[in-house]
Regions:
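Pyridoxal 5′-phosphate
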Residues: 1-271
Length: 271
């Protein structure tokens, strides 16, 4: 969870500097949700810019634009979003009159000695061949989400999350990370003592056709904290965990199937 005392001290220490605060709305490892309303209020008290990474958050929840100045979205995490484009929602007053990277489609006119850029903010930051099909796919993915309805999604996710929590308690030698925090998405990261998460993921995929994620999930520094590792510590094997992400299209029967497969896999790999 966010250490708000530390955040307040950091903001206070840097109050005379330009502050750009970027936070993840939800952990892609443990599913822990950030209190974005409190973050936004605190950062803006110091006249800072608020940016949120909504990659893991956006498939399950919505956020009002009043709480951020910039929002980063990965549409491929939504149903139907595979191949969809990444999205940036940003306030116009944060956009300059020059592109971050000059490229085809951003320049209005160029000579040997000068150039002028387009005045359209979207065109300035979309140099090169536009990903039209990718953008259409992203749009359709959000239409599916909206048609299902956020209330229906959240209700189903709570049911699945609680059920999964109870089933986890039946597995011996299981280490669940951030286990005491309930304000989370139905994303779980755990290890089984004495068994490699990579071996478990391989067996679940090969024999039971269950796709999980083994490793550090692009969260190495956070992983060091979760696993109790020291910086620059020499390791004999690659550290990590097994991550399970539930979805509102799942049913309790899918969870039962997973735990049946997990139990059989543990027995097999323990010998």
């Amino acid at each position: 969870e966010i250490d708000f005392d530390f955040l307040e001290k950091t903001l206070q220490k840097n109050k005379k500097r330009k502050i750009i605060a970027s936070f993840s709305l939800a952990s892609n490892v443990t599913g822990i949700l950030s209190d974005y309303k409190r973050i936004s209020e605190m950062v803006r008290k110091f006249k800072g810019i608020v940016a949120f990474d909504a990659s893991s958050f956006i498939p399950y929840k919505n956020i009002s634009c009043q709480y951020y100045d910039a929002l980063f979205i990965s549409s491929h995490k939504l149903i139907g979003g595979i191949g969809g484009s990444g999205l940036l929602a940003i306030k116009k007053d944060l956009c300059g009159n020059k592109p971050s990277f000059a490229a085809g489609g951003t320049v209005g006119y160029v000579s040997r000695t000068s150039q002028c850029y387009l005045c359209n903010e979207e065109a300035l930051e979309e140099g090169g061949t536009p990903g039209i099909l990718q953008l259409i796919r992203a749009s359709l993915a959000f239409k599916i989400k909206d048609s299902i309805g956020i209330k229906n999604i959240e209700k189903k996710e709570e049911i699945l999350k609680d059920y999964f929590f109870e089933k986890l308690k039946t597995i011996p030698n299981l280490i669940l990370y951030a286990k005491n925090l309930k304000t989370r998405l139905p994303i779980f990261a755990f290890n089984i003592k004495g068994i490699s998460p990579f071996d478990i993921a391989y067996e679940l995929s090969k024999k039971y056709h269950i796709e999980t994620r083994a490793g550090c999930a692009c969260a190495g520094p956070y992983g060091h904290d979760l696993l109790g590792l020291k910086d620059n510590q020499k390791l004999k094997t690659k550290p990590g965990w097994l991550r399970i992400s539930l979805h509102y299209t799942h049913e309790k029967e899918d969870i039962d199937y997973f735990f049946n497969a997990l139990n059989k896999t543990i027995v097999k790999l323990s010998h």
